[in-house]
Amino acid sequence: PEVIIADEPTTALDVSIQAQILALLRGLARQRGTAIMLVTHDMGVIAEIADRVGVMYAGRLVEIGPVAAVLHSAHHPYTAGLMGLIPSLSRRVERLPQISGNMPRPGEWPGGCSFHPRCPKAGPRCTIEVPAPVAVSDSMVACHLFSGGTSVVSGDLPTKEAISTRETAS
């Protein structure tokens, strides 16, 4: 296969079994020359195994880019909110942070950007129009805050060839 899809392959596993599963996935991908599409909520696993990461909210891709760029310099307000939820070992807090509001119920998606009811930066356009992905630095972001970027076709993701060409050119 050209891609191995692993949906939450390390959820609820202890650290040693998790490491074995990740090593197995890496070995299979290397041996067969395939990519791995990892579906997970575990940011530690993403940081360890992935080259690129896509962040989804309510079934829509809101940001995609190199792991380091997305994890350390998130552009989309949802991605930035997620990164802000990761507890710091160097800082003691009495209450863990959270993203305000609630996820919409399946089938009851709001109009426009699905994150707008929870977004601290939402404007009127966000309630009406679904944002098209735009190129921002090395990432693609579906957010009206970045509408001055280079537009891409809505839902269009970079191909494997485009990614390797862009990375080779850098």
Give residue ranges: language-model regions.
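Short catalytic/signature loops enriched in Gly
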Residues: 66-163, 170
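Intrinsically disordered and other compositionally biased segments
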Residues: 15, 21, 44, 154, ...
